[in-house]
Amino acid sequence: MRTFEAAAYLRRIGADTVEVRKLFSSTMEAYQRKAMLVAHAKVYRGCAIAVSPDHDAPDIQVTAAQAADELLNISGVQASFLVFGLNGGMSFSARSMGQVNVQIIMEKLGGGGHHTMAGAQLAGIDGDKAYELLIAAID
């Protein structure tokens, strides 16, 4: 809803919607990576979870956040988690529609944030271990 309100506000004050769209464009590689993450997500207890096979991919933090947002559009998904490799460890990008407090889940992994948007970083682990720890934090 906030995106729609922001777009309506920008239009009201005379912003060029084509120029705004250009600001939010991404490379084909980043778009394909986001689509792959969404396509390979699994749902566990109302939470969509995707683990990126790419480590230190270009713009992975932005791509993961966008994919996490996109997963919330799936019926029955109350929260989403993207797990991705960055700087020799694993990072988490978490989003929620409000029913699940992702801040609390990310705090269990040493991270933090807000009720509907949070994250964490863990050094020295791989994607499988990160997934396992995330499942335990959700439980």
Regions found by a protein language model. Name each.
Residues 1-139:
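Hydrophobic helix-and-loop "lid/oligomerization" segment in the mid-to-C-terminal part
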